[in-house]
Amino acid sequence: HNTCRNTPAAVKVGQATDVLVIPGMELCTAEEAHVVCLFETVEDALAFDKYVCAHIPKVPNRPEIFGEQWVLNENDEKIGEISELLITATDISINDVQALVKEFNGVAFPAHVDKDAYSVTASLGAIPPEAQFSAAELSLTADAAQQRLLHPELESMMLLRSSDAHYLHLMPEEHQTVEL
């Protein structure tokens, strides 16, 4: 969360194995809602990362509690470590994310809106129209029709499915296509 510093390695590995890796970040907003932010290039992602670094509390990570926060190269070798705790909320508002990410040649959409934690719907009860999202992410097992009943604002949005996996071995093998 709140970093793109491992995207250069991920993109290199993807290129070597013929897998498309889209540079991105799962941002934690001021409202403690997670938003997926995807970028055209690694450079755009890293520029956004720099912006986010200036908007995250300077709380030191405690690896014994929260785990290590390493930056790795394409060979899984440690090349750096992030000292600030990354799981905290930034001071970036959910209503500002879409326009902000666009400035960095990216797109953004609220993550796992069907979940009871760290989703915009859990935090605010709905997706605010001021946020101007045109898509939203549902978890793999979510009932899209039920979610649309609970959150009518989803009717006008493209719904994407994702596992919210944070480790490769937890990613499903299903393939999805998004026309860009």
Language model segments and positions:
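Active-site gating loops and adjacent loop-to-helix segments of metal-dependent hydrolytic enzymes
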Residues: 38-83, 126
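Internal catalytic-core helix/loop-beta-alpha segment
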Residues: 76-78, 82-114
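Charged catalytic cores and adjacent phosphate/nucleic-acid-binding surfaces used
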Residues: 4-46, 99, 104-107, 114-180
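Metal-associated gating/positioning segment near the N- to mid-region
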Residues: 1
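Short low-complexity stretches enriched in small and charged residues
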Residues: 59-68, 88-95, 112-118, 133
